[in-house]
C-alpha cells in the first residue's frame, strides 16, 4: 500500500563491531514481518480512521483473504483506553471481513493470538500503538 519510510539514523541498528543489533527496539518494529505484511497487502486498500476520542484513534485497513487490520493509536501523553467492536466494523461496506460469532485476533507486536466475540477494549500506552490482524474464527486458515 505504501513504502515504509524511515526518519531515523539507521546506523543505530548496528553494534560497534558492525553487526546488526537485534535488540534494537526500532529495528524490531520496522522489520516486523506481520506489520510489513499489513503494509504490503495485495488488496492495496489504505486504512481509515473509524473512531477517535481526539487522543486515541481506531484505524481500520481491509486486507486480502477477508481479513482486517486494526490499529489503536494513542497520540496522547498518558495511557488511554481504546475500544472497538469487530461486528460493528464488519457492517461497514469498506470492510471485507465477514460477520462472525467469533473472531481470531493476532496481536502483531506480541505475536500472540486470541479469540473474541469482537468486543475489544485495550489500554494503549502513551505515544504507542496496538496492532491486530483479525479474521473470522469460523473461516480461519489451516482449519484453526
What does each model-identified segment do?
Residues 1-107, 122-131, 135-138:
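Active-site-proximal substrate-binding groove within the catalytic cores of carbohydrate-active enzymes
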Residues 107-116:
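Short beta-strand and strand-turn-strand segments in soluble, beta-rich domains
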Residues 138-144:
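Mature N-terminal, pre-catalytic/accessory segment of carbohydrate-active enzymes
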Amino acid at each position: 500500500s505504501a513504502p515504509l519510510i524511515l526518519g531515523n539514523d539507521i546506523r543505530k541498528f548496528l553494534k560497534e563491531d558492525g553487526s546488526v543489533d537485534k535488540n534494537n527496539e526500532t529495528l524490531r518494529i520496522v522489520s516486523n514481518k506481520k506489520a510489513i505484511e499489513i503494509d504490503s497487502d495485495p488488496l492495496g486498500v489504505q486504512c481509515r480512521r473509524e473512531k477517535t476520542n481526539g487522543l486515541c484513534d481506531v484505524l481500520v485497513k481491509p486486507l486480502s483473504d477477508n481479513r482486517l487490520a486494526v490499529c489503536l493509536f494513542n497520540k496522547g501523553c498518558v495511557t488511554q483506553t481504546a475500544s472497538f467492536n469487530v461486528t460493528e466494523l464488519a457492517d461497514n461496506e469498506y470492510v471485507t471481513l465477514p460477520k462472525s460469532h467469533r473472531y481470531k485476533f493476532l496481536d502483531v507486536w506480541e505475536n500472540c493470538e486470541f479469540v473474541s466475540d469482537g468486543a475489544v477494549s485495550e489500554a494503549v500506552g502513551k505515544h504507542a500503538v496496538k496492532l491486530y490482524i483479525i479474521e473470522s474464527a469460523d473461516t480461519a486458515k489451516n482449519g484453526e
